[in-house]
A protein has these predicted regions:
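Short, Lys/Arg-rich N-terminal segment immediately upstream of the first membrane anchor
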Residues: 1-8
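Hydrophobic membrane-insertion alpha-helices, especially the h-region
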Residues: 9-28
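Conserved aromatic-histidine-acidic binding/catalytic patches
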Residues: 30, 34, 102
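Alpha-helical transmembrane signal-anchor/signal-peptide segments
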Residues: 33-47
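Extracytoplasmic/periplasmic/luminal assembly and interaction segments
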Residues: 44-117
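Short acidic amphipathic segments
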Residues: 56, 114-133
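Short, low-complexity, Pro/Ser/Thr/Gly-rich segments in the mature regions of secreted, periplasmic
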Residues: 132-144
Length: 144
């Protein structure tokens, strides 16, 4: 009888663990299907320039009808501070350098294209940008 009791207790604990892990996945780790669809649209409709760009523009979340997208630049992270991560040959170049200017224009062009693709999707009325701090840190760029 004691053996059956221990076995039942182990099964109960195992079921609780499985349910807890399932809840963590369902409520915290899985990607929102709408966000996944928006990112799939970017992937499918992107020009070769956007598809092959050094930074993966993507939707992070959907707040009602507002798509929040990741970006490597913002007023807090101007282009001159992060351009070297995208184009290592431009690290330390002056912002008026012709190659720097061309790279800045290319960044703006592909970012705008990603935004336009997302805005074309049903249920999205606006795009807001959020600085991709994890990407910047992973590329050795200080946030302060």
């Amino acid at each position: 009888m004691k053996h059956e009791s221990r076995l039942g207790k182990k099964i109960t604990i195992a079921l609780i663990v499985v349910l807890a892990l399932g809840a963590i996945y369902w409520f915290g780790l899985r990607t929102d299907p709408k966000v996944a669809a928006l990112n799939q649209a970017i992937h499918e409709k992107a020009s070769p320039a956007l598809r092959d760009y050094h930074y993966p523009f993507r939707v992070l979340r959907l707040d009602d009808t507002v798509a929040v997208m990741a970006t490597p630049r913002s007023p807090a992270m101007p282009v001159y501070r992060m351009i070297g991560a995208l184009y290592p040959s431009l690290a330390g170049k002056a912002p008026d350098n012709p190659d720097f200017v061309a790279a800045e224009k290319e960044l703006a062009k592909v970012q705008s294209e990603a935004k336009d693709i997302v805005l074309e999707q049903p249920g999205v009325t606006e795009v807001k940008w959020e600085l991709d701090e994890n990407w910047l840190i992973s590329h050795g760029i200080s946030l302060n």
